[in-house]
Amino acid sequence: LMEYSIHDAIRAGFTKVVFIVKPEILGLVRTLCGDSLRGKTTRGGKPLEVCYAFQDFESLPAFYTLPAGRTKPFGTTHAVLCARDYVNEPFCVINADDYYAVDAYRTIYEELGKLAPSGESTMVGYLLRNTVSAHGTVSRGVCHVEDGHLTGIHEALKIQLFPDGTIADVADGQRRELAADMPVSMNFWGFMPSIFDQMEEYLDDFLRALPPEEIKAECLLPNMVGDLLKKGRLSVSVLHSADRWFGMTYHQDRQAVARELARLHENGTYPPTLRS
């Protein structure tokens, strides 16, 4: 799915791709995707810039002592912060295993050109009903939107689609029904480079507050955005996509994803092969 995202981003006008990877999978990422980008050009005809940023424990602040037994990465805020040295322009953030659809990239690229250098960002929101899986629960950033801007966001960690079509968050053994047409975040964010200072500050505060023995907690991007919203330090415009998101949350999703991609090739959304 990452190849489709890169293809769509280049068509929209983006000129650089930064892969954020664990050092031990760099070779795999190069083989599966990075090497195929050699010779690719941007919409303006210039060579596509491709970079690799490592998310590892070495990039954590010096004051933090890693607890014994910690192997889990520190989450999406830390991941994006690891790309700081490679990003000096407005940028978008995506998940590698999600398909966001063509129009979303055009929309966010245009919006990034309108943002102030600091204090403003953007996101693409999707209807909840278009982002659930029939094969198990999913986690989503539930968005609260007023006048086209995000006013709050919280992570619903266990959203389930039931046979009768209802959707509910079933975390903690409770069942809290959710509106099928409510907007959710799929981690498709648009930021200005000034956000890195705020990310660094938030990650520092997150790490200082962790119990010394904590080995699983993650510093998540939606939580950082929500914190900045509460403090009045960030404004987030919400762009809407009626397109159907799809992704590889579960192995059983693979067949449906393959069918949908085949349909998109057949109807001309994509050429016969992305590597031509």
Language-model features, listed with the residues they occupy:
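Short, surface-exposed amphipathic charged segments that create phosphate/polyanion-binding patches used
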Residues: 61-73, 136-141, 252-256
